[in-house]
């Protein structure tokens, strides 16, 4: 069997050890004569899987007991609506940062429910960084403060937690479990699973109990109410059981790697060596302010964009898959989430060096 290095932005690479476990358990999970994909979501087998996954995630992120962890259907984009629906309460205003494609989409969705107030807009920097926090326009009152921790398309990542007294809401879809952080600084965190936690179709929400007491907007469907999901422990209806099971396996894998702090060091090394190569090159370029460069999604361009197709073709032939940049930006993008090995990054750097020698 020959596997490639998969640099896809999502669905993304899954640790091989996890895939081997899935393969071994797929037909007969723990000797019950069935796949975990076939069991009842209310049976003791899956309830055990679900509870263990939640315990492991709570341990990995040091989530306080004053927070609920929800395992919900749908992608992060659904949260663009669920957040204002559930958290606005009597407020007319919510604060947002426009840092790139995904925050911009969240702002557009929020306009259906409130008046999004822009604290700052990275567009003025051509989305190559975040304006200095001292320049942000921060109101004294608002329902919440929303930002995207890592912009997968633009290749921007926050190196700090914004300083605010407002309820902090964060989209961590592409970097949850990639570095330690203080959960207690946040009111609500959400992340889709297909970057660092497995399969598309599952989104994890970590929400403080106090926010569950806010009254949703009157038009909010019951199925989109956080409080109801919390009350039913994410079992209002049949949850995405296989995605939940796989996320649990990945949580075990993270623990076996030594935890989130160990992965953070590895992620920093991977990103640093790739950026170092790009910065030394006259053939490849990354436009992002080094302070805000993403550790998860490294975007780069070739000096001669006519060579883009050839670069992608030869990369694929050399076992380096899914390096094409997002359709909105073009160029290249190497997504190096937790599951990407250092060997994979080294292989990419080696190929880029050889390609530059041939065509630079």
Curated annotation (Swiss-Prot):
Cofactor annotation: pyridoxal 5'-phosphate
Entry's Gene Ontology molecular function annotations: O-phospho-L-serine:2-oxoglutarate aminotransferase activity; pyridoxal phosphate binding
EC number: 2.6.1.52
Residues the record lists as binding pyridoxal 5'-phosphate: 102, 152, 171, 194, 237-238
Pathway membership, UniProt: Amino-acid biosynthesis; L-serine biosynthesis; L-serine from 3-phospho-D-glycerate: step 2/3; Cofactor biosynthesis; pyridoxine 5'-phosphate biosynthesis; pyridoxine 5'-phosphate from D-erythrose 4-phosphate: step 3/5
Compartments, as annotated in UniProt: Cytoplasm
Residue numbers binding L-glutamate: 42
UniProt modified residues of type N6-(pyridoxal phosphate)lysine: 195
PROSITE patterns cross-referenced by the UniProt entry: AA_TRANSFER_CLASS_5
GO biological process terms, semicolon-separated: L-serine biosynthetic process; pyridoxine biosynthetic process
Gene3D superfamilies reported in the protein's UniProt record: Aspartate Aminotransferase, domain 1, Type I PLP-dependent aspartate aminotransferase-like (Major domain)
GO cellular component, one term: cytoplasm
Pfam hit, one: Aminotran_5
UniProt catalytic activity: O-phospho-L-serine + 2-oxoglutarate = 3-phosphooxypyruvate + L-glutamate; 4-(phosphooxy)-L-threonine + 2-oxoglutarate = (R)-3-hydroxy-2-oxo-4-phosphooxybutanoate + L-glutamate
Complex formation: Homodimer.
Physiological role: Catalyzes the reversible conversion of 3-phosphohydroxypyruvate to phosphoserine and of 3-hydroxy-2-oxo-4-phosphonooxybutanoate to phosphohydroxythreonine.
Protein family (similarity comment): Belongs to the class-V pyridoxal-phosphate-dependent aminotransferase family. SerC subfamily.
Protein name: Phosphoserine aminotransferase
Originating species: Coxiella burnetii (strain Dugway 5J108-111)
Gene for this chain: serC
């Amino acid at each position: 069997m020959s596997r490639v290095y998969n640099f896809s932005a999502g669905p993304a690479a899954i640790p091989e050890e996890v895939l081997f476990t899935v393969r071994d358990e797929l037909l007969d999970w723990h000797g019950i004569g069935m796949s975990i994909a076939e069991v009842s979501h209310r049976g003791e087998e899956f309830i055990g899987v679900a509870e263990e996954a939640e315990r492991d995630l709570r341990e990995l992120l040091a989530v306080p007991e004053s927070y609920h962890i929800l395992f919900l259907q749908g992608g992060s984009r659904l949260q663009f609506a669920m957040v204002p629906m559930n958290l606005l309460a009597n407020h007319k205003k919510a604060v947002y940062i426009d840092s790139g494609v995904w925050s911009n989409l969240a702002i557009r969705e929020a306009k259906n429910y409130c008046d999004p107030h822009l604290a700052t807009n990275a567009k003025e920097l051509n989305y190559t960084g975040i304006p200095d926090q001292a320049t942000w326009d921060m109101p004294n009152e608002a329902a919440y403060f929303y930002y995207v921790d890592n912009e997968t398309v633009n290749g921007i990542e926050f190196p700090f937690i914004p300083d605010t007294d407002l309820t902090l809401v964060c989209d961590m879809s592409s970097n949850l479990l990639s570095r330690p952080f203080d959960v207690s600084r946040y009111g609500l965190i959400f992340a889709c699973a297909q970057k660092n936690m497995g399969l598309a179709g599952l989104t994890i929400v970590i929400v403080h109990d106090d926010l569950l007491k806010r009254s949703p907007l009157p038009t909010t469907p019951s199925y989109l109410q956080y409080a109801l999901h919390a009350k039913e422990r994410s079992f209002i209806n049949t949850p995405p059981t296989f995605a939940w099971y796989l996320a649990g396996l990945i949580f075990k894998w993270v623990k076996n790697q030594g935890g989130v702090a160990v992965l953070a060091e590895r992620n920093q090394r991977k990103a640093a060596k790739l950026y170092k190569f790009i910065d030394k090159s006259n053939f490849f370029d990354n436009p992002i302010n080094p302070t805000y460069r993403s550790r998860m999604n490294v975007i780069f361009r070739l000096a001669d964009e006519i060579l883009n197709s050839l670069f992608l073709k030869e990369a694929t032939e050399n076992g380096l898959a899914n390096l094409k940049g997002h359709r909105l930006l073009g160029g290249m993008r190497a997504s190096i989430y937790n599951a990407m090995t250092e060997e994979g990054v080294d292989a990419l750097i080696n190929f880029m060096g050889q390609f530059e020698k041939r065509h630079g």
